[in-house]
Amino acid sequence: MINDGIIATKLGLQGIPEMAEIIIIERDLALLDSIKCRYHISQLSSAKSVEIIKNKKENIKFSCGVSINNLSLNENDIGDFKTFLKLSPPLRTEEDRISLVKGLSDGIIDVIVSDHKPEDEEQKRLTFAQAETGASGIETLLSLSLEHYHNGSVKLETIIKALTSNPAKILKVNKGTLSVGSDADFCIVDLNKPWIVKQENLQSKSKNTSVENKKLQGKVMNTFVKGEELFKL
């Protein structure tokens, strides 16, 4: 999948317009205004969607998320048919990416998701049209999110909430905080530890990362689940 724009035209690929996303969001929010049920938009990808949600949240209660891929990359990163960047929703323009980051910073967007969709290499080493969509994202989610803290675009507290307490509230699970009575699921992070994404160092069985060879800052050092340490770097 690729954004319907200049890059798709240059590569001779059929793109997906932002209107495909906008129409669904506007339709669902119109229904939500009448039905009054719980509603979550899993992954936004366009500036126009952020604008719509900002206006609708003044009168309607719902939540929304964004993929870390769409916060960190844009359609130009696809370059010459990089199939590891064939994602759903597609990467859009740099202007869209900046609007998504601002939407997160302003509290319009509630959660950041990994959009973890591992695929074996054979399914990605095909033509762009034939390749499967998706990227392995769990192991790079935190570090890519912290990029926006390190460059000053999003407060650390906002990033932490978007990765922990906000998803827990949406799913109504007893997690995401260190308050008394909550499940002791947490991690210890070195905010400044530098590392480089290398396929051979990823724990995931599938290595289809969207950010191979990218230099990142911030790393999980320990992970605890229900108080038990399950991972240590």
Residue ranges, per PLM feature:
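His/Asp/Glu-enriched, well-ordered alpha-helical/loop segment
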Residues: K10-K36, S105-I112, K117-L191
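Histidine/acidic residue-rich metal-binding segments in metalloenzymes
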Residues: M1-I112
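C-terminal cap of metal-dependent C-N hydrolases
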Residues: T127-Q130, D183-L233
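Short capping/connector residues at structural and topological boundaries
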Residues: E18, N76, T83, P90-R92, ...
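Short, glycine-/Ser/Thr-/acidic-enriched flexible segments
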Residues: S46, N69, K117-E119, K193-P194, ...
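Residue-level signal for inorganic ion chemistry
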Residues: Y39, G65, D115, S145, ...
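Glycine/Thr-rich phosphate-binding loops of Rossmann-like dinucleotide-binding domains
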Residues: V50, S72, D120-E122, C187, ...
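Residue-level signal for pocket-adjacent positions within structured domains
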Residues: A8-L11, V66, K82, K86, ...
